[in-house]
Regions:
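Domain-level signal for soluble alpha/beta catalytic cores
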Residues: 1-377
Length: 377
């Protein structure tokens, strides 16, 4: 299916997979993929229950079916067959009445320089799973429970080569920030520019934090917004869940579902609410906001007047660029102008980029070096 899948203004997703399968006998310490493939009837029955409750998009149970997660159970080389078979179970459940989303999630890797894993390795892991999901025939990709912008970027880059929609949902903490500490609005702007087709939140904190985050980002969003709240303290009563779903719609979400703790009954309650829902007007951007140039890193968002951008003098890349970054901040310039002459320059900049407070702008006469810098940053 192509990337122009028609999505209704209000679309209902499914609810939790793992917590419902725990109730069906799956243990938290065993490989979920092996358990599901040895209990296909349980997986199909759960999917069909969501379908009957009103879900129009079912997530294939491929959440942790990437090489890094499967390696814990000696299955790193089985990414393709495991994803293919799990998508097949979702297809049986949907019976042609719902779209199937290929589900990608965090790998558990720790990226350089704080960790030992490279961004290239992260991209390879997601590329392998995305290829398997595409071959299995998913209708769209959902990259969910993302903890940080870099990992979300890697997954988006892996999925984007296929002509299918790519959705991303981030996990929030109790302060309404990304679990990495990043700002939801900065994340939205970054991923929109990467070409995602929908953006939002799942898991992490509960619906209250999602309502706040949605109200913050909805005036700026040019893609549909997703809300799939989890309930770590226990699933609420059905009427409470339906009311929370309504509040998420009022805050700007158009695609809703449930995460940890949400059952088919909860999705049914949200479906009943949707049949009576009256859309609320959203606050527009001011004309000044519409004309701004928006720049982001994971922690901050910068709005610049395109006629008044103050650049630094060209900054050459090197092993330690922190003094240059501090000087740009001290001089109160708007943007650092960074010279990228070789692919190694791109590596040098990426290695220190976490220390940069001022936005960066690359210039280069070498297309390969510039492409590498954009890829890493």
């Amino acid at each position: 299916m192509q990337d122009d899948i028609p999505i209704p203004r209000y679309t209902l997703l499914d609810g939790a997979t793992a917590t419902n399968l725990f109730s069906a006998g799956m243990r938290p310490d065993e490989c979920p993929e092996e358990w599901m493939l040895s209990h296909p009837d349980q997986v199909i029955a759960l999917g069909r229950a969501y379908l009957e409750a009103g879900s129009r998009i079912l997530y294939a149970p491929t959440f942790s079916a990437n090489a890094a997660q499967l390696a814990r159970f000696g299955l790193a080389d089985a990414v393709a067959p495991i994803n293919r078979e799990l998508v097949g179970l979702a297809r049986q459940a949907a019976d042609g009445r719902a779209l199937i989303a290929g589900d990608l999630s965090p790998t558990g890797l720790s990226l350089e320089p704080a960790g030992e894993d490279s961004f290239d390795e992260l991209c390879r892991i997601y590329a392998d799973q995305a290829a398997a999901l595409d071959e299995a025939g998913v209708d769209l990709f959902v990259i969910e429970t993302m903890l940080s912008v870099p990992e979300a970027r890697a997954a988006v880059l892996a999925c984007r080569k296929y002509k299918k929609p790519v959705w991303v949902t981030m996990a929030l903490n109790e302060e309404g920030m990304l679990l990495s500490g990043g700002q939801p609005l900065a994340c939205l702007v970054t991923l929109e520019r990467l070409g995602v087709d929908a953006f939002g939140f799942n898991c992490g904190a509960g619906p209250e934090e999602m309502v706040t985050a949605l109200r913050t980002i909805s005036p700026y969003a040019s893609v549909p917004l997703i809300a799939k709240p989890g309930f770590p303290a226990g699933a609420p009563a059905l009427d409470v869940f339906a009311d929370e779903a309504r509040r998420l719609l009022d805050a700007g979400a158009g695609i809703i579902g449930g995460c940890c703790g949400a059952t088919p009954e909860h999705i049914g309650a949200a479906h009943n609410m949707l049949t009576r829902y009256v859309p609320q007007p959203m606050a527009p951007l001011t004309s000044a906001q519409e004309n701004d140039i928006w720049l982001t890193n994971e922690m901050a968002l910068f709005a610049l007047d395109e006629d008044r951008i103050d650049f630094t003098e060209p900054i050459a890349c090197g092993y330690d660029m922190t003094d240059d970054f501090l000087a740009a901040e001290r001089d109160s310039v708007d943007v650092m102008l960074v010279s990228i002459e070789t692919p190694d320059d791109a590596l040098d900049f990426a290695g220190d980029a976490r220390f940069a407070v001022v936005p960066g702008c690359f210039y280069s006469d070498d297309p390969e070096a510039l492409s590498r810098a954009l890829f890493l940053y």
